Amino acid sequence: MVHLRRTLAPAWWPIPRKKGGVWVVRPSPGPHSLAYSLPLALIIRDVLKYAKTMHEARYIISRGYVKVDGVVRRDYKFPVGLMDVIEIVPTGEVYRVVPDADKYYNLLPISTEEAALKLLRVEGKTMVKGGRIQLHFHDGRNLITTLEAGKQIKTFDSVLYDLRNKAIKAHIPLKLGVNAVVIHGSNVGFSGTLYEIVWTLKRKQSVVALKKGDEVRRTILNYVMAVGSEGPVIKISP
């Protein structure tokens, strides 16, 4: 389907529910799921306000004026999600999609120096020919690495990825003491030090606790992303 009923769209989408018609653009199949992505056209029209109508938003995108992770995207339905880097070519403005307590996901202005950097969470690993390991990331990206490097990087760890050179710049293990941020659920946007993990049979459902000052928030392991050893390795908050 090309469209989605407004009333069925994810609650965090910045669209009116009872105005603007019955339908809204549905994200095309891609790197992020419907629940955790926003169509590129809605970002241009409803978030950044570069367009007043869907027709104008589609025109801007079709002209190649918008890049996602350094690649020109001409599909107005392209799904944009967590940690994606959006660049408006004519103005040079660059934004990162970050978890936010109020908006669920928000666009954070970043410098052009950071435009080539992206945090990726490892969702799984597989062995491939030649005794190498392929890493699977949260944005659908895959990367083949050596057996030695692949063994060190665990599922749910994060890596700092160089979009231009297509290479890992840093490895951030998800372990006690690491700085992490909640990326889904009711505590989305909360960041702090990971100070407790209660393991369960289903690893994704293990309970973790993040602490920031005197405040403690608990969520499940699947909702947490490591962002740095002592602090975020890139800008993820204002």
UniProtKB/Swiss-Prot annotation:
Residues covered by the S4 RNA-binding domain: 38-101
Annotated protein name in UniProt: Small ribosomal subunit protein eS4
Stretches of the chain forming a coiled coil according to its record: none
Cell membrane found in the keyword field: no
GO biological process, one term: translation
Keyword field contains Ribonucleoprotein: yes
NCBIfam families reported for this sequence: PRK04313.1
Organism listed in the record: Pyrobaculum aerophilum (strain ATCC 51768 / DSM 7523 / JCM 9630 / CIP 104966 / NBRC 100827 / IM2)
SUPFAM superfamilies on file: Alpha-L RNA-binding motif
UniProt KW keywords: Ribonucleoprotein, Ribosomal protein, RNA-binding, rRNA-binding
Xref: CDD domains: KOW_RPS4 (cd06087), S4 (cd00165)
Residue intervals passing through the bilayer: none
GO MF annotation, one: rRNA binding
Family: Belongs to the eukaryotic ribosomal protein eS4 family.
GO cellular component: cytosolic small ribosomal subunit
Highest taxon of source: Archaea
